[in-house]
């Protein structure tokens, strides 16, 4: 199976549209819920989400990635992994059921017990949906993925908001999470129409597991240590403090996850198909890095500048303690676009052992930074994330210096134009906070001026990725007009 440039472009646009539309709706739902539910109850869900995410990584086991990476994967492969994942999800549910009490004791939060036991039901739905998503990614069916994500987030949002309005508190968040995963799984069953055969092949499972366990190890380590700061904050600080940190990470993460997930979903299957054509992979990596930075950097810079009026208007002043975390963690995210396509290329070329070894090295560094920073307070923990991502930038870029003859300097230079233009944009809108205008007027003015400044500079300087994207949009527009005529 080989994907044309047009197929890749359409798939990327579908995936990006799906992520943005879903996240915009989810963001609106979050705003409403944040106004109805106090930060401390959000903190309770944040504590539980850490353990649920770890269980989800175990359920996937890197096997869904292995299905996408395998060139000739058929329904026997998908069915084998499907039944394995479902079996693991049942086992993990009971692990979480009995672990609920010790987890609650660890955090001195007895209210966690029933919430953990109810929310863990999501693991079964996640197991089914993980294989559905692997099938979609393998066959570039991202248009179908849009419908399940779009309608499920609307329906679950209605349920969550209704329950929050009725005073259910933390259980409104639980109901929203479960219904979202349930609706996604059900709708995808109708739109994708993939069905497992009643078969489990040990012969097929062995090579998939041989590749997947390394991806699993990498993903588990990443998930554990991404949440390590939240675990520490949840243990040594109040749930409300964790909620502020979580919200501070959630807002820039909204920007990152939409674009990263879209790019990641497209790059991995494409890289896997061309895994033997190293010059082509290098060229695509360079293009994807530039495109990622073109979109992500101005959004992160904008968030740093407008964080205070944004939080005050959308979430109310009770969430203003999240503003410093938003700004600090936005800086942390600046290093990540450079490594995304790099990481996907290494996995697609079959070097999952390299990703595992490097993750172990990085997490040793992360532990050292976290252990030191925890003694200096919650803001030091956040700045520790910045230091960690800066160090990881060079660790992540090192392998492709040898594998693809792609130097670290060359990889970093791909991000420089977008970074410089974003800094100019940030400086142009920062001064506006001194104007004697309302927060709504300030926020609106900064967004409009920022967009004008960024786009104008990109156009006047003929920034490569901007002109490429502009040309792509023009060609698609002409094609649509031609079809209509």
Over which residues does each language-model region extend?
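Interhelical loop/hinge segments that connect adjacent transmembrane helices in multipass membrane
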Residues: 1-4, 8, 143, 186-227, ...
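Helix-loop junctions and terminal segments of transmembrane helices
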Residues: 56-75, 137-138, 248, 252-296, ...
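Membrane-proximal transmembrane or re-entrant/amphipathic helices at the cytosolic face
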Residues: 398-401, 406-408, 415, 427-485
């Amino acid at each position: 199976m080989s994907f044309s440039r047009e197929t890749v472009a359409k798939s990327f646009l579908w995936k990006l549209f799906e992520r943005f539309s879903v996240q915009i709706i989810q963001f609106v739902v979050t705003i409403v819920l944040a106004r109805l539910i106090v930060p401390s109850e959000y903190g309770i869900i944040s504590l539980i989400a850490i353990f649920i995410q770890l269980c989800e990584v175990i359920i996937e086991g890197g096997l869904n990635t292995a299905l996408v990476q395998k060139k000739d994967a058929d329904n026997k492969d998908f069915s084998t992994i499907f039944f394995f994942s479902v079996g693991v999800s049942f086992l993990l549910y009971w692990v979480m059921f009995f672990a609920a009490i010790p987890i609650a004791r660890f955090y001195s939060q007895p209210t966690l017990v029933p919430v953990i036991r109810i929310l863990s039901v999501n693991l079964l739905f996640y197991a089914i949906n993980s294989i559905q998503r692997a099938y979609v990614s393998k066959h570039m069916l991202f248009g179908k993925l849009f419908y399940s994500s779009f309608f499920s987030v609307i329906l679950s949002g209605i349920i969550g908001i209704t329950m929050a309005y009725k005073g259910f508190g933390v259980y409104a968040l639980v109901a929203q999470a479960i219904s979202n995963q349930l609706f996604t799984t059900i709708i995808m069953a109708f739109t994708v129409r993939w069905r497992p055969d009643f078969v489990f092949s040990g012969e097929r499972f062995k090579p998939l597991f041989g590749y997947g366990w390394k991806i699993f190890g990498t993903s588990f380590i990443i998930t554990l240590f991404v949440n390590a700061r939240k675990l520490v904050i949840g243990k040594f600080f109040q749930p409300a403090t964790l909620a502020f940190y979580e919200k501070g990470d959630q807002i820039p993460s909204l920007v990152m996850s939409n674009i990263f997930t879209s790019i990641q979903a497209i790059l991995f299957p494409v890289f896997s198909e061309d895994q033997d054509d190293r010059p082509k992979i290098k060229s695509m990596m360079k293009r994807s890095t530039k495109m990622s930075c073109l979109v992500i950097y101005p959004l992160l810079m904008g968030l740093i500048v407008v964080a205070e009026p944004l939080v005050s208007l959308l979430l109310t002043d009770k969430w203003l303690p999240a503003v410093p975390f938003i700004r600090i963690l936005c800086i942390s995210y600046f290093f990540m676009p450079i490594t995304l396509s790099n990481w996907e290329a290494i996995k697609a070329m079959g070097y999952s052992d390299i990703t595992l070894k490097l993750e172990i090295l990085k997490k040793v560094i992360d532990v050292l930074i976290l252990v030191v920073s925890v003694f200096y307070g919650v803001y030091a923990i956040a700045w520790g994330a910045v230091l960690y991502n800066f160090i990881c930038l060079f660790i992540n870029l090192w392998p492709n210096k040898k594998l693809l003859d792609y130097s670290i300097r060359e990889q970093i230079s791909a991000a420089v134009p977008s970074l410089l233009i974003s800094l100019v944009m940030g400086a142009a809108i920062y001064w506006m906070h001194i104007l004697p205008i309302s927060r709504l007027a300030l926020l609106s003015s900064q967004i409009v001026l920022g967009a004008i400044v960024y786009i104008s500079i990109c156009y006047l300087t003929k920034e490569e990725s901007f002109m490429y994207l502009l040309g792509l949009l023009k060609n698609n527009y002409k094609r649509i007009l031609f079809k209509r005529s």
